[in-house]
């Protein structure tokens, strides 16, 4: 059954599971102190959907989806959380329906996102330590911020150019305590 299949592999020294719901990897029971980058793709699956026209073949009016998605991104950039909320919910709901076989919007998208993030991780591997890869973003630890940040930024920029996606960067200095991919917290210095 395709929906239940999963593949367990090691990527950048981190155990990963690739399955119907996304790609997930994390160093288990990990604690470290240092400088980390939290790198997330902006509205990843809806952005993939628009960039590569995934699902358009089953939509009567894809321009309606584009309006919802573009409004979500516009309000995010303006920092207007209240105005953004309904568009964000609709944007993500549309992408979520795309992996449901009983949905009129069925057109699986998740594998596309998994492969593109895997590509990013492989290009970043020489310049940082992968801590976590979670469906729409990654956390990496920098050994030397002054030496490595610009190279990482260049790799991410090149990835954005190839994929049409946009990334959000947050630099974090402190400690990470991680049980697994969905159970972690960051503590500021």
What are these model-predicted stretches?
Residues 123-127:
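A structural motif corresponding to the C-terminal end of an alpha-helix
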Residues 129-134, 169:
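Short beta-strand
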Residues 98, 141-189:
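C-terminal polymerase-core module
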Residues 1-37, 41-50, 85-115, 119-122, ...:
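Common nucleic-acid-contacting/processivity interface regions adjacent to the catalytic cores
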Residues 44-96:
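Metal-dependent catalytic core segments for phosphate chemistry
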Residues 49-53, 134-135, 152-155:
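Composition- and surface-driven signal marking solvent-exposed, interaction-prone regions
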